[in-house]
Curated annotation (Swiss-Prot):
Binds 2 Zn(2+) ions. Keywords: Endonuclease, Hydrolase, Metal-binding, Nuclease, tRNA processing, Zinc. Its EC number is 3.1.26.11. Its cofactor is Zn(2+). It is an enzyme of class 3 (hydrolase). This is Ribonuclease Z. The lineage of its organism: Bacteria, Bacillati, Bacillota, Bacilli, Bacillales. CDD domains: RNaseZ_ZiPD-like_MBL-fold (cd07717). The gene is rnz. Zn(2+) 2 binds at D67, H68, D212, H270. It catalyses: Endonucleolytic cleavage of RNA, removing extra 3' nucleotides from tRNA precursor, generating 3' termini of tRNAs. A 3'-hydroxy group is left at the tRNA terminus and a 5'-phosphoryl group is left at the trailer molecule. The active site is at D67 (proton acceptor). Belongs to the RNase Z family. It comes from Bacillus cereus (strain AH187).
């Protein structure tokens, strides 16, 4: 599991930061990539990374401001032109379906893969399978905006190979049957229960990716006990009133959410273009005063998510 930040700016692109898009690489977990927001020129940013459009399985949109969705039509079309045939699902607030369908229709873009568009109308679970559970809550951004909590389900423990070897069980088909929890009988008549040879489960990770938002309780709830919290930091602490007026957060407010939620790690993004060059490091300094395990994203930077 790895984050690749494709765009980390706020509102409009700047020389150093494109607008919002985050790839969550789930290559080891499911051989796929999930995308969170898709601002203008996201597909250009992808060209400079290891992200492959054909592997994008799901796109989660936080809200319908242009800096979060204007890259969608081009990316959806290019995925088809590049030979993508596997299904893709887009999740987002009401209106995302109309935006995509009109853009594709007017441009006569025909995608050659199954495209499903799911409009989120209420809080709660938006996706679940045997590996992941994704839930959402409304944030405070003036228009409907959602934050996402991605919960990886616990992973079965490893087969205790050394224990089996000590008992004289040789590697082979029996190992798989025991790994699957079956009860097997050895040639000498010994009965083995697979459950006795499985180590403790690996706890799944929790990832929280928030859209644009003021400081609010929903952010804390989504981030509770998260292994990684990705939070916007459009403004410095001294501009807290301006952040409130424009439905955004400061770096220190993001750190406060991480602290209150008992998150393990905080990554700041959605940085205003007013912070050019190294001036953005002041945002990082402010956040670390409150929550030490804070990092700040820059375009094309990757962040592995360890277990």
């Amino acid at each position: 599991m790895e984050f690749v930040f494709l765009g980390t700016g706020a509102g409009v692109p700047s020389k150093g930061r494109n607008v919002s898009a985050i790839a969550l690489q789930l290559l080891e977990e499911r051989g796929q990539t999930w995308l969170f927001d898709c601002g203008e020129a996201t597909q250009h940013q992808i060209l400079h990374t290891s992200v492959r459009p054909r592997r994008i399985e799901k796109i989660f949109i936080t809200h319908l401001h242009g800096d979060h969705i204007f890259g969608l039509p081009g990316l959806l079309g290019s995925r088809s032109f590049q030979g993508g045939t596997t299904p893709l699902t887009v999740y987002g607030p009401k209106g995302i379906k109309q935006f995509i369908e009109v853009a594709l229709s007017v441009s006569t873009t025909h995608v050659k893969y199954p495209l499903e568009i799911v409009e989120i109308t209420e809080e709660g679970t938006v996706f679940e399978d045997n590996e992941f559970h994704v839930e959402t809550k409304r944030l405070s951004h003036g228009i409907e905006c959602f934050g996402y909590r991605i919960i990886e389900k616990d992973i079965q423990g490893a087969l205790l190979v050394d224990k089996l070897l000590e008992m004289g069980v040789k590697p082979g088909p029996l190992f798989k049957r025991l790994k699957d929890g079956e009860v097997v009988e050895l040639e000498n008549g010994t009965i083995l229960n697979g459950q006795d040879f499985i180590g403790p489960p690996q706890k799944g990770r929790i990832i929280t990716i928030l859209g644009d938002t003021r400081f609010c309780e929903a952010s804390r709830e989504l981030a509770q006990d998260a292994d990684v919290l990705v939070h916007e930091a459009t403004f410095a602490a001294e501009d807290e009133q301006q952040a409130y007026d424009y439905f955004h957060s400061t770096s220190k407010q993001a750190a406060s959410i991480a602290l209150q939620a008992n998150a393990k790690r905080l990554i700041l993004t959605h940085i205003s273009s007013r912070y050019q060059g190294d001036t953005y490091k002041e945002l990082l300094k402010e956040a670390r005063e409150l929550f030490s395990n804070t990092e700040i994203a820059t375009d094309l930077k990757s962040f592995p998510v360890e277990r």
